[in-house]
């Protein structure tokens, strides 16, 4: 019988600026529950002609979407939310965001004619949520955009 463990799987953004997408899992190997923290993009430069946006491949978590509890967005910079409307249609899970971030991602989905009203959960600054085994607090900090959290 396996014991419970916490896993961290960075799909993008670790050790670089841009493309932030981190996965966390908790539980026994045969019953792990997952969350995604941020779904960001990076911006291509002239070295990749014809490419505008780059974001992490979500294939790993798409394969585990039945055990995915939701996406938690830390703040509204593009390197943290820019891929949400590209990634979410394959996941169709709950999205947790502060009010300002929620407004911006709602507009991203409107551009793609996707209504996320039923899936979007607004969390106030310093608010707390529980997703399965995860207790998450939206702790505020100083940053260059409204309502940043960690």
PLM ranges: what are they?
Residues 1-72, 77-150:
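His/Asp/Glu-rich metal-coordinating catalytic cores
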């Amino acid at each position: 019988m396996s014991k419970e463990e916490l896993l961290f799987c960075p799909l993008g953004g670790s050790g670089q600026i841009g493309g932030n997408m981190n996965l966390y899992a908790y539980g026994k190997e045969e019953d792990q529950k997952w969350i995604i923290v941020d779904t960001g993009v990076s911006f291509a430069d002239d070295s990749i002609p014809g490419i505008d946006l780059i974001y992490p491949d979500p294939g790993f978590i798409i394969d585990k979407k039945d055990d995915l509890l939701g996406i938690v967005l830390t703040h509204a910079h593009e390197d943290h939310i820019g891929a949400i409307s590209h990634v979410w249609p394959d996941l169709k899970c709950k999205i947790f965001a502060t009010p300002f971030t929620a407004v911006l991602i709602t507009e991203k989905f409107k551009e793609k004619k996707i209504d996320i009203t039923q899936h979007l959960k607004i969390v106030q600054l310093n608010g707390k949520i529980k997703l399965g085994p995860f207790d998450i607090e939206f702790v505020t900090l100083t940053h260059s955009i409204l309502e940043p959290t960690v």
